[in-house]
């Protein structure tokens, strides 16, 4: 609490033209976006987009983007969004600032995500669980093999040929 600052600013209450007080939140967001299961990403990502799964309440600034949906399992969606295929798609169809990805709502909503049965999502869900377990045990753990296996499953979901996979991977 800063009662002197608030008292000073309250002197100008008649001048304010909006409900946003100078000591209040600017463009506050609904609390539901911070609670429960969600995917969080930095709005500006270097090298490739990075999406993190969270199953606890956490409050982040607007430099982060929060995703909540009931159409897909959130761990499945985390795996797909972190895939090389989605990075390739965002590089060509999303917003870029130089070589940095800008993760925004519109490009993400444009990703043609497959609506598939939970049983087909399960291999990716299991791999994301394995990554979360390894990272919880050791934040520096090498998860490259698990990420490559997720990429393989994502390529299969979209029916990519070997030549298309080479294009995505820049080979």
Q: Model-predicted segments: where are they?
A:
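Polybasic, glycine- and aromatic-enriched phosphate-binding surface used to engage nucleic acids
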Residues: 1-120
């Amino acid at each position: 609490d800063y009662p002197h600052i608030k008292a000073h600013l309250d002197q100008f209450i008649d001048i304010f033209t909006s409900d946003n007080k100078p000591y209040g939140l600017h463009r506050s967001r609904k609390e539901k976006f911070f609670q429960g299961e969600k995917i969080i990403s930095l709005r500006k990502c270097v090298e490739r987009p990075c999406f993190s799964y969270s199953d606890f309440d956490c409050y982040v600034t607007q430099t982060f983007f929060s995703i909540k949906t009931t159409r897909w399992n959130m761990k499945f969606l985390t795996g797909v969004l972190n895939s090389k295929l989605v990075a390739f798609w965002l590089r060509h169809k999303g917003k870029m600032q130089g070589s940095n990805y800008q993760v925004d709502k519109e490009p993400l909503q444009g990703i043609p995500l497959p609506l598939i049965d939970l049983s087909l999502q399960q291999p990716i869900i299991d791999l994301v669980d394995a990554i979360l377990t390894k990272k919880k045990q050791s934040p520096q753990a090498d998860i490259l093999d698990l990420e490559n296996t997720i990429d393989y499953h994502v390529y299969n979901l979209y029916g990519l040929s070997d030549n298309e996979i080479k294009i995505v991977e820049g080979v």
